[in-house]
């Protein structure tokens, strides 16, 4: 039996077990442990808490580089939700260990609706895109800050993609907890996503079972961030691939337009030619640099990197 495996601190490695029950042994000539021996990797720890509803929500955290319990550090919160769990991987599109290396604490949560915790837990996403999941995340962040006094509670950022991008936008309509936010390929209007893109209808066939824009305004309007845009106060970065076949670009564009009309801090970055998942190396690096620069601007009060990538200009 052979498989690839990795952890939050160990890169991908091929493992082989000679028979069921046998201890797996690393295979191959590449020693990733040696490759990373001069790289500072943040300590990864489990985190869980009980919500006001009595549910146990799990996740994990990464300590920032240079961690000192007597100092203050900004925090970045990552989540997905919406029927997919967050993984504990070193190799990841959103390089959480790199963020830790830049001096951020990192908190990763698996809120209600995530698979892997039983059918009842997963089914909480059905016809309930917004509030319950958002409540889990907000409660989790507050509890994590209460338990970890090294966090600067005025410098907390959040980010997510796809449904996680929707959740970023929705969170900002519910709380002022965050000082900066990133929505990648996020959904702003559940009604317009319902019939758009390759997966809009098929995804909602399960996620909004027997609910449609004409018979469930509580879901399609009251849980869509676009219809609550005036509540958003947090600086928001919207990123979207121009060739996204899952979530059409208008989902970011209409939120950008709304927030611009409202005079809010919002930036929209298009990734030319990129699909829902950005696979081309140079474009992935563009996305990552944009993420790092955005958080540096708002959570570390240093706009140098951002201004180097995106020159200030008057329109």
Where do the PLM segments sit?
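Residue position within the beta-strands of beta-propeller blades
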Residues: 2-4
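Short loop/turn positions at the edges of beta-strands in beta-sheet-rich folds
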Residues: 8, 51-53, 175
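Structural motif
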Residues: 9-16
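Short glycine-rich, flexible loops that bind phosphorylated cofactors or substrates
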Residues: 10, 85-86, 190, 246
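Glycine-centered loop/turn positions within well-structured domains
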Residues: 12, 55-57, 245, 276
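Cap/lid segment of the alpha/beta-hydrolase catalytic domain
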Residues: 21-23, 30-162, 167, 193-203
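Conserved beta-strand termini and adjacent loop/short-helix elements that scaffold enzyme active sites
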Residues: 27-30, 271
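Active-site-proximal cap/loop segments of hydrolase catalytic domains
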Residues: 108-315
């Amino acid at each position: 039996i052979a498989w690839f495996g990795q952890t939050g601190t160990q890169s991908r490695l091929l493992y082989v077990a000679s028979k069921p029950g046998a201890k797996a042994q690393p295979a191959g000539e590449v020693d990733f442990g040696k490759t990373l021996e001069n790289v500072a990797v943040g300590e990864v720890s489990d985190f869980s808490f009980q919500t006001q509803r009595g549910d146990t929500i799990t996740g994990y955290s990464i300590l920032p580089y240079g961690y000192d319990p007597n100092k203050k550090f900004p925090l970045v919160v990552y989540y997905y939700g919406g029927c997919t769990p967050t993984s504990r991987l070193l190799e990841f599109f959103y390089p959480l260990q790199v963020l830790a290396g830049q001096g951020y604490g990192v908190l990763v949560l698996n809120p209600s609706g995530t698979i892997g915790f039983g059918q009842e837990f997963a089914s909480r996403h059905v016809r309930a895109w917004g509030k319950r999941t958002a409540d889990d995340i907000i409660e989790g962040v507050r509890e994590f800050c209460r338990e970890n006094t090294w966090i600067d509670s005025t410098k907390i950022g959040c980010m997510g993609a796809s449904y996680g991008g929707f959740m970023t936008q929705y969170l900002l309509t519910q709380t002022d907890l965050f000082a900066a936010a990133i929505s990648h390929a996020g959904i702003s209007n559940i009604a317009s996503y319902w019939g758009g893109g390759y997966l809009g209808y098929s995804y909602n066939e399960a996620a909004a079972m027997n609910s449609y824009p004409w018979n469930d305004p509580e879901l399609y309007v009251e849980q869509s961030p676009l219809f609550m845009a005036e509540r958003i106060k947090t600086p928001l970065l919207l990123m979207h691939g121009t060739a996204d076949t899952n979530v059409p670009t208008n989902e970011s564009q209409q939120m950008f337009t709304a927030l611009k009309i409202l005079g809010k801090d919002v930036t929209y970055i298009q990734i030319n030619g990129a699909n829902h998942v950005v696979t081309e190396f140079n474009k992935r690096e563009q996305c990552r640099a944009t993420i790092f620069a955005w958080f540096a601007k708002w959570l570390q009060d240093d706009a140098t990197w951002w201004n180097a990538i995106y020159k200030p200009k008057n329109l």
